[in-house]
């Protein structure tokens, strides 16, 4: 372990000695005027696109009391890709699973009968 530590210290010393001294970089100076644009007021909040026309976007509504975190910038509906299935969908799913299990069982029986010798 001492050999590894000594090798590491020697390598760092050698690397530091081989690098020429450079003057420190000049200090950062803040710009005289702000470089950004202020946000437009709420009624003229636009969504930008590659097309030359602009479409106004609706403003966000106030969040309800039990909500947490950010309410989001716009009030568009969020698509739900996975929802809770209704009772009919669950019954169809169970029927399909049952039919698949029955077909698999019948295939197994058919192969067992074909394999028997009389």
UniProtKB/Swiss-Prot annotation:
Q: Where is the signal peptide?
A: 1-17
Q: Where in the cell is it found?
A: Secreted
Sorted alphabetically, the Gene Ontology BP terms of this entry are: vitelline membrane formation involved in chorion-containing eggshell formation
Residue ranges annotated for the VM domain, each copy included? 36-75
**Coiled coil, from the record:** none
Write out the transmembrane intervals.
none
Keyword tags: Secreted, Signal
The highest taxon in the source lineage is: Eukaryota
Main localization of the protein described in the UniProt heading: secreted
Is Secreted found in the keyword set? yes
Gene Ontology CC terms? extracellular space
Q: Does the keyword Cell membrane apply?
A: no
**Disulfide bridge map:** none
What terms describe the molecular function in GO for this protein? Answer: structural constituent of vitelline membrane
What the protein does comes down to:
Major early eggshell protein.
- Annotated family: Belongs to the vitelline membrane family.
Q: What is this protein called?
A: Vitelline membrane protein Vm32E
What organism does the UniProt record list as the source?
Drosophila mauritiana
């Amino acid at each position: 372990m001492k050999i590894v530590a000594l090798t590491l210290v020697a390598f760092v010393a050698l690397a530091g000695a081989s690098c020429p001294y450079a003057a420190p970089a000049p200090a950062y100076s803040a710009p005289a005027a702000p470089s950004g644009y202020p946000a437009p007021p709420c009624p003229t909040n636009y969504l930008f696109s590659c097309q030359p026309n602009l479409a106004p976007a609706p403003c966000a509504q106030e969040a309800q009391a039990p909500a947490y975190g950010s309410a989001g910038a716009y009030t568009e509906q969020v698509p739900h890709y996975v929802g809770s299935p209704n009772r009919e969908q669950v019954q169809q799913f169970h029927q399909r699973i049952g039919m698949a299990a029955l077909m698999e069982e019948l295939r197994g029986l058919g192969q067992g009968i074909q394999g028997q010798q009389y």
